[in-house]
Amino acid sequence: MRNRTRIAWTFLVPTLVLMAMVAGWPLGRSIWFSLTDTSINDISAGKFIGLANYFGEFGLFANPNYTEGFWKSDWGLSIRNTFQFSIVSVVLETLAGLGVAMLLNQDFKGRTLARAAVLIPWAIPTIVSAKMWGWMLHDQYGLINQVLLDWGLIAHKIAWTADPSYALWTVVAVDVWKTTPFMALLILAALQTLPKDCYEAARVDGVHPLRLFWKVTLPLIKQPLMVAMVFRMLDALRIFDLIYVLTSNNSTTISMSGFVRREMVENGNLGYGSAASTSLTLIIFLSAVLFMRTARLKLSEESS
Amino acid sequence: MNSRQSCHLAAVALALWTTASSQAASLTISCGSNAAQVASCTKFAEEWGKKTGNTVSLYQAPASTSEALALLRQQFAAKASELDVIMVDLVWPGIIKDHLVDLKKYSKGAEAKFFPAIVANNTVGGKLLAMPWYANVGLLYYRKDLLEKYGLKPPETWANLAAAAKKVQEAERTAGVKDFQGFVFQGKAYEGLTCNALEWVYSFGGGEIVDAAGSITINNDKAARALDAAASWVGTITPGGVLNYAEEESRGVFQKGEALFMRNWAYAWALGQAADSPIKGKIGVSPLPAGPGGKKVATLGGWQLAVSKYSKNVDLAADLVLYLTSREVQKKRAIEGSYNPTIVDLYNDKDILAVNPFMGSLTDIVGSAVARPSTVTGAKYPEVSNAFWDATYDVLAKKASGAEAMKKLQGKLKQVKRSQW
């Protein structure tokens, strides 16, 4: 037994060391920075200031200089924007993904080709597809405005990515386009594991397809569906690249990751920015835990 | 041959190799992002390379100046030696002063012929941190053929500009040019918007955000009125998409012939007069208009050349800097690319004026240009600029009135200032 433990440790140690170097040390340093007032101008000159970056006079939360309240401040606004984006985006992607998965589950000619084709939006790197969409959505010489104008659906050209009232929802639309294949694939994998005899019996009994969906399919894929939603939600809460490339990046549409980048990279406040990124991690962790609690997600082997 | 001869041969070869490699240094210069800048810079850097027997390779910086600064600061934090010569924006010396070499001992007084304001801007703590390379001011470009067609003159005030733009825009749209715009400028939330907005605010008499003594002066009604005026253009004479336009996007609309007025930097002239430009020969340039009771003003911009402290070839790099900022090279660049020289007497040069007729009037514009408060706010300038462009963006996007935005901005600037700049 001791021999087996030793062998197990021998196999695990390289991975653990590598993870500590690549993930553990930067994370630890980042958390350490968040407790100091380091600036990028001279990284070695940072002083320890405890939790002042979080709760102090010029901190993230409980800052007395937030003249219009926490939710109108840059940090509060970024939290609100990110959650708005994530919730709408994940719901839409799940519904669309479910539909696409149900379709791809049927047997039809060219099904393999369709399954491969559906993956294309997910496969293109986000920067490339975001730039592409940015050109199509351009207000003066973009394709989308031209097409909508020609079909008479809009009266004059809309500034999709510049107008603050449209910007966030445009980003949601592009994100749904990009990530629906991911959800569809995860749900399809779940659908393929369903036992066929249930459906045979239902067909013999003449059950309505919609009832079949609600009473049989959905409960059976509930667990994988919730897992896919948690994955997507964790991703969506970290959204950065779409907003950065598509929109103008001012404070009203900024996401939490965008705020972190602005503080750390553009303003050079490594201490304050690290505090923001640590808070971001904790917020995402809490959201995931809450979601799994509410969905009563049981990840262990004992099924209901 | 015997071992002694081969030993000698090896020694000679080694000596030759080391002397050859110690002469042919390889420098890296970061000097621009768009194709025209890169081509011009490479040409003159390679000339220097041939003359001195070194090679110069190009490092392409990001297009947005805010991003270029962010990247540069990270490289300085890592003490990277990859960059030798850096093109530095007017507002950067105060921010990156700890990482640049003092050029006074290399320039030997050559800076006396340059614009004093720019040299003063580049001198921090008694050290000359960068040589001025080309000056930039905001200019008003207009379609002189259209102004003639409708019997109008270049506008003297912003109100004139708005009226002229409205008239021509309506007429052109009825005549069939469907997306004709009156006025395009840079409205994206980045440093360029700070430049545009400072022009509006200062020309209305609203001051310069933070004054020379360090007090926050932006919360006044003249500044609020300036921003409200600008917000009134968006959606009427300016497309809503201007909120996402940087320099190239606004130039794209103007160069396609779809705008009457454009506010942009001097580089747009050479590109607008290029052989394949649809508006060649149809553009004019004038100073930006004044606000009511205020005066005409442009934001001072411009780029300088500096040497990184972490470079492995500081002397050679300084030599390259002085070559590129010399009289001959600046004159050639003014003629070929309409880069405004930083040597004052070049503005009276006949050859330059033949190609860029408006440069004669530029001496006054550059001399009276307003600088952004980068020197007084030092390393906190990026945050100050960020807060200012955010506030302006909110007003342009009609999310806040000028007065509300200025009040909020004052609170934010107090937060940035903390106890002192």
What are these model-derived regions, one by one?
Chain A
Residues 4-304:
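A structural signal for multi-pass alpha-helical bundles of membrane permease subunits
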